[in-house]
Amino acid sequence: MKKIAWSLGILVTIGALCAIVWPSWYPSRPLVTTPSQADIQADQSSPRDLLEYFLSGLGETSLPVIQQQVQRYEQENQGLLIDSSLFAQYVQYKAALSELTLPQASGGLSTQEWWQLHQSLLDLQARYFSAEQQALFAEENRLRELAIEKRRIYEQYGQSEEAQRAWQALLLDQPDFIQRSEATAQLLPQLTQAGQGDTQQRYLARVALVGEQGAQRLAELDDSRATFEQQFQDYYQARAAILVRNELSASEQQTQIQQLREQHFAPEQWRRIDALERLKDNGE
């Protein structure tokens, strides 16, 4: 079984369904941002986009700092769109996504397996959000369901006029925003291209979960994580070499290790490095 990493990317917007629950007007106060967000205008048109905006700062800053930013936003805007409680639920939901598993299939996932994945997502949403709050995911869920249904149609009829007629008939029953949505056309090719190896299958699963932009963001995070892991391995080996130098006193060893840490990592990463050192020292 394969685990799907949780997403930090920008997801499919909520659209008209979300407006049923939350007001369509919103405050325009500037938000606290990380350096990489300085030139990004926060999308406050829906709660989902605003949640993703705050979470996108994770990595440059810590979760507690982001939680403080959300609290400040809540206080300044009377809890419109999102509040601390909803943000906490969303973080828990994202963490649960990291534990979601897929069956390993050499030829890619079947339509039934994609449908099971879809149902697993609905179950997770129901676990962490109220019925009203689940409007956060309404458009994304419907688009995913349609993409899987389109896959089923073309599996049944092949690339034929009959398949095209069946698909068009299904689309006609959908709301206008679904029919117009480019996400429908963008999601299906990713779903129907059965995974060619582990990397692509993972990418397809992420597209189903978080959309194209989210999948790309996760791929970037994979690269960043791999870079960090290699950086830590290099650091840990150099640290080990310092610790076996008997001519150095314990104080001198710690001084050199601290200098080594400063060369490899930013100060905000040091607590994480401490934890990783302890785990590795204990053979975990």
From Swiss-Prot:
Signal peptide range in chain numbering: none
GO MF assignments: unfolded protein binding
Highest taxon above the source species: Bacteria
Database matches in InterPro entries: Lipase_chaperone
Record's subcellular location: Cell inner membrane
Membrane topology: Single-pass membrane protein
GO biological process, one term: protein folding
Family: Belongs to the lipase chaperone family.
Protein name, UniProt field: Lipase chaperone
Species of origin: Vibrio cholerae serotype O1 (strain ATCC 39315 / El Tor Inaba N16961)
